[in-house]
From Swiss-Prot:
Name of the protein this chain belongs to: Adenylosuccinate synthetase
Superkingdom in the source lineage: Bacteria
Organism: Clostridium botulinum (strain Alaska E43 / Type E3)
Cofactor(s) demanded: Mg(2+)
Keywords of this entry: Cytoplasm, GTP-binding, Ligase, Magnesium, Metal-binding, Nucleotide-binding, Purine biosynthesis
Membrane-spanning residues: none
Role noted for this protein: Plays an important role in the de novo pathway of purine nucleotide biosynthesis. Catalyzes the first committed step in the biosynthesis of AMP from IMP.
Length: 428
């Protein structure tokens, strides 16, 4: 039995798409357990590039079962747009390759309207939402007024729940947020059409995943975003609306913790984040700009430029602790090639002492000053390496320090965006 998790160990955008695609070769089932189409994965296979948002990365293989679990929030319109995109580039998406939990919450048009209007109302205190309705959908889930996929499969149930939600949401949208009311009939007709297309993909995914694990099939749980965007352990409130840590797997798909054998944390060789929020090692200078351009650090989903900075090992160590990481995959060491000197954060100066953990309070975090160690850089030959031995010595020293500080072995190294630009040095 082998069931393992692939998680982001930073603020997302660590290269999970590529690593999930790489590791999916060893898996028979690939499962998304949280988030929605606010996530973005880029996978390069040969000379082709694929951009995924909601559908698991295993869809690029013909022989993998891909699962969207109950912890995911599903926008049917975005789902079928992604299916059409994949079909258009030659990737088949059928109910034999993709199944969707009947317990997953549906993103509705009013969720997206609320997302945009509430963000606008926050003014300078906006949190950088993607505007895709993710947060409002999770809010409805916990307020117990959300509409699930299984509700959409029963027209009378869906109609009743939609009518109640439209009545309440329109009052809030018009009277509090100053927006335009949404049409009940338009949404009803649109979603009943979605129901017909969605039905063949829908089943109890918890049972399906459980059965596959019991049959000793290899299952890969694919995380979206990153540890520091977790609703509990991230830089709150500049976070996403779900649990992005290993704990989210059990509730987000419906399997017990004893069924998960390993957890791989994905980290870049440097640090990035999108939008607002604290970033202790951020480089607001030419070096930061250089990393952004060389690393093509622009969001897959939003197109927003990413803030760039030195590698912060305090963050990665926190991710290893919170999610019980059994190994790390370090990506994009090729991006740093050409820099003569590098810095790595190994602690924060805070209130006269050095700490190696991430404070909960943003006010405390703002007072933290990074403690750096210096490293010599390496050249572009790193992108040609296919074994650990072929890596430049300075790159090896850099990687060894990551493993030492986080007390977590490195199992995989990414030296470029393509599937074949991956070095496997240990088991996960």
């Amino acid at each position: 039995m082998s069931a393992f998790i692939v998680l982001g160990a930073q603020w997302g955008d660590e290269g999970k798409g590529k690593m999930t695609d790489y590791l999916a070769e060893e898996a028979e089932v690939v499962v998304r357990f949280q988030g929605g189409n606010n996530a973005g994965h880029t996978v390069e296979v040969g000379d082709k590039q694929y951009k995924l948002h909601l559908i698991p990365s295993g869809i690029l293989y013909d022989d993998k079962l891909n699962v969207i679990g109950n912890g995911v929030v599903v926008d049917p319109k975005a789902l079928f747009e992604e299916i059409n995109y994949l079909e258009g580039v030659g990737v088949k998406v059928t109910p034999e390759k993709l199944i969707i939990s009947d317990r997953a919450q549906l993103i509705m048009p009013y969720h997206k309207t609320l997302d945009v209007l509430k963000e606008k109302a926050r003014g300078k205190n906006d949190i950088g939402t993607t505007g895709k309705g993710i947060g409002p959908c999770y809010t409805d889930k916990f307020e117990r007024c959300g509409i699930r996929v299984c509700d959409l499969m029963h027209e009378d149930v869906f109609k009743e729940k939609l009518e109640e939600n439209i009545r309440m949401k329109n009052e809030y949208i018009t009277k509090v947020l100053g927006g335009e009311p949404l049409s009940f009939s338009e949404i009803l007709n649109e979603y009943l059409e979605f129901a017909k297309k969605l039905r063949p993909f829908v089943q109890d995914t918890s049972v399906k995943v459980y059965d596959n694990i019991k049959e000793n099939k290899t299952v890969l749980f694919e995380g979206a975003q990153g540890m520091l965007l977790d609703i509990d352990y991230g830089t709150y409130p500049y976070v996403t609306s779900s649990n992005t840590t290993a704990g989210g797997v059990c509730s987000g798909i419906g399997v017990g913790p004893n069924m998960v054998t390993n957890a791989v944390g994905i980290t870049k060789a440097y640090t990035t984040r999108v939008g607002k929020g604290p970033f202790p090692t951020e480089l607001i200078d030419e070096t930061g700009d250089w990393i952004r351009e060389k690393g093509h650090e622009y969001g897959v989903t939003t197109g927003r430029s990413r803030r760039c900075g030195w590698l912060d090992l305090v963050i990665v160590k926190t991710a290893a602790r919170v999610s019980g990481l059994t190994s790390l995959a370090v990506t994009k060491i090729d991006t740093l090639a050409g820099l003569e000197k590098l810095k790595v954060c190994v602690g924060y100066k805070f209130d006269g002492k050095v700490i190696d953990y991430f404070p909960a309070s943003l006010e405390d975090l703002a007072k933290c000053e990074p403690v750096y160690e210096d490293f010599d850089g390496w050249d572009d030959s790193v992108a040609e390496a296919r074994t650990y031995e072929e890596l430049p010595e300075n790159a090896k020293k850099y990687l060894n320090r990551i493993a030492e500080f986080t007390d977590t072995k490195i199992s995989i190294i990414g030296v470029g965006p393509k599937r074949e630009q991956t070095i496997r040095i240990d088991s996960i």
